[in-house]
């Protein structure tokens, strides 16, 4: 994938930034692919940088992801909770599986979705192979992650743990309005005023 370059004029001449570096200057982090350890390390590094730069200003995490590794995603989640700024989460396109979990983990009142996005929750996927003892170990690990994710989803949404467990047994897709009613997000957003801060500031 070709990454766009942004050219800026300043008193010192022209400066070139890749689009993600330019967005980072506005405290915008973009999670736009499947979550794996490499992506998680990049997201964590950006969150830590923005925390060090200004611990008082919000960070905007835009999510368009089909999900991915639970352990990698939990690294992002733990960092979101570890740093001092509020992390505003915004779904644009798709937030599925770990993507939906991270969307729900944003600061309360600052979890959002654009109007035509889709949001999906389900249980962790597993493909255990090998000897019986190895399969048993992997199965226990999957059940551990399932319980942890369900507990956090119940905390994020306010839903009873029994409903979370039932709804995540299969792929459970929601529109933004349905996700708002469910408690995964706080608002569905569209336009923002010209010249304002990024759309994630709406409602603050």
From Swiss-Prot:
It comes from the Bacteria. One of its GO terms (biological process) is protein quality control for misfolded or incompletely synthesized proteins. GO terms for cellular component: cytoplasm; endopeptidase Clp complex. Keywords: Cytoplasm, Hydrolase, Protease, Serine protease. The active site is at residues 97, 122. Its EC number is 3.4.21.92. GO terms for molecular function: ATP-dependent peptidase activity; ATPase binding; serine-type endopeptidase activity. Pfam families: CLP_protease. It catalyses: Hydrolysis of proteins to small peptides in the presence of ATP and magnesium. alpha-casein is the usual test substrate. In the absence of ATP, only oligopeptides shorter than five residues are hydrolyzed (such as succinyl-Leu-Tyr-|-NHMec, and Leu-Tyr-Leu-|-Tyr-Trp, in which cleavage of the -Tyr-|-Leu- and -Tyr-|-Trp bonds also occurs). Disulfide bonds: none annotated. It is found in: Cytoplasm. Belongs to the peptidase S14 family. HAMAP family: ClpP. Cleaves peptides in various proteins in a process that requires ATP hydrolysis. Has a chymotrypsin-like activity. Plays a major role in the degradation of misfolded proteins. Fourteen ClpP subunits assemble into 2 heptameric rings which stack back to back to give a disk-like structure with a central cavity, resembling the structure of eukaryotic proteasomes. This is ATP-dependent Clp protease proteolytic subunit 1. It comes from Nostoc sp. (strain PCC 7120 / SAG 25.82 / UTEX 2576). The gene is clpP1.
């Amino acid at each position: 994938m070709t990454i766009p370059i942004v050219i800026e004029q300043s008193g010192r001449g022209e400066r070139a930034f890749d689009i993600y570096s330019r967005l980072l200057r506005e405290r915008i982090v973009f999670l736009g692919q499947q979550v794996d350890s490499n992506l998680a390390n990049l997201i964590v590094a950006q969150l830590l940088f923005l925390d060090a730069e200004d611990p008082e200003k919000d960070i905007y995490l835009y999510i368009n992801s089909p999900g991915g590794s639970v352990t990698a995603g939990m690294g992002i989640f733990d960092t979101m909770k570890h740093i001092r700024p509020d992390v505003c989460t915004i779904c644009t396109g798709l937030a599925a599986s770990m993507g939906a979990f991270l969307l729900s983990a944003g600061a309360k009142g600052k979890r959002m979705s654009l109007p035509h996005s889709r949001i999906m929750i389900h249980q962790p996927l597993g493909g255990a192979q090998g000897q019986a003892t190895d399969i048993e170990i992997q199965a226990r690990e999957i059940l551990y992650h399932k319980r942890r994710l369900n507990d956090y989803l119940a905390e994020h949404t306010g839903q009873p743990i029994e409903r979370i467990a039932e709804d995540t047994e299969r792929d459970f897709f929601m529109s933004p309005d349905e996700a708002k009613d469910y408690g995964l997000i706080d608002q569905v957003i569209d336009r923002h005023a010209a010249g304002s801060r990024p759309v994630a500031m709406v409602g603050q």
